[in-house]
Amino acid sequence: MRKHFLLKLLAVLLGFTLVATACGDDDSSSDSAADDSAAADDDAEDTVEATQAETDLLDAIQDRGSLNCGVSTVSIGFAVQDSDGIYQGFDSDFCRATAVAILGDAGAIDIIGLTAAERFTAVQTGQVDLLHRNTTFTQSRDSDVGMDFGPTTYFDGQQLMARVSDGFSSSSGVADIDGAVVCTNAGTTTEKNIAEAADLLGITITLNTFEDFDIVSQNFIEGACDVITTDGSGLVGRKAEQQPADQEWVIFPGQPISKEPLGPTYGQNQSRFADAVNWTVYAMLIADEYGVNQANVDDFVGADGELGRLLGGEGEVQSAMGLAPDAFYQVIKQVGSYSDLWDRHLAPLGLTLPGSVNDLWTNGGLMYPPPAR
């Protein structure tokens, strides 16, 4: 009897199990498929992220054989196209110097002109490997935008430019632009800085912004803008190149209204590429510390100590960085030292290096490269 009872109980339980399983299959078949699909999507996203994390940008550039570098299209002295459509300027030559360090050839590069609105997306999407595009290093750009910044190549500051005939002088200040139509680039720290400065001073301005500083400048020339504002170096370039013969433009205030540390910008978490970019800048500054430039660098090959290491001699560190031992010798030989670039592109605009914040620390400036060892 006991055995018969247990067999009946087992049969009942088995029946319940089959019914429950059947009902469960009816209710959850679509959910199960959705779960599988979601899991597959998650796996795909994980795969993309893993692939991106595993892709070493320095290796990719060396395999590709060229560097993609973004610059401004309208920054006089820093990046403008010549009559042959080739970008020339301080920033453009820093792009070339980086190409030399990584690939050994200043011509192994595609220099791409970008607007202020395009520049960060171009890095994030991989259109460019690097920006040398008068881009200010800020907290939000370093964190929220997801960029990494290299050493400052130009310490700048925002200033304003207006016409003397409108009552402005070099001693004018921001308070003197009350009621003025002020024009600048859209989507820049410049736009934010001038709006904030006006608010803090309790003055009223009409702020008009444009995508391209060529348009800003043209509006100023035509009288549609009373004042224009951007980095001081940019205003110096515009004044030198575009001031009409019948007008006198003046830049003010003497003390810039902001800090604008400009330098190379690249995507996050690419430390080997970042090292190559950063040490290209440092090498060009260290060369100046020793009085080495494009014209005389051959005289210093085989030097002892830090300079010898920098130029590829005994104890060099470039090989460990994934670069050629003489990478920085080639940078100086093919492109130049920091002061070579300044003399070539910025001095003709009236920008003075000696004694400025952009001079070496030994001359009272802020340029202080770490030691090459």
Identify the residue ranges that each predicted region occupies.
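Immediate post-signal peptide segment of exported/extracytoplasmic ligand-binding proteins
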Residues: S30-A33, A38-D84, F168-V181
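Acidic, polar ligand-binding/catalytic clefts
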Residues: R96, V100, A108-D176, S233-I257, ...
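Bacterial lipoprotein signal-peptidase II cleavage site
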Residues: A20-A34
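Sec-dependent bacterial lipoprotein signal peptides
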Residues: M1-A20
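Extended ligand-binding regions for polar small-molecule ligands
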Residues: D46-A50, R96, V100, V164-F168, ...
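Bilobed "Venus flytrap"/periplasmic-binding protein-like clamshell domains
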Residues: N68-G77, Y87-L103, T136-F137, D156-Q218, ...
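Extracytoplasmic small-molecule ligand-binding "clamshell" domains
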Residues: T51-L131, L360, G364
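Short helix-initiation/N-cap motifs at beta->coil->alpha
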Residues: E54-T55, I109-T121, S169-S170, L207-E222
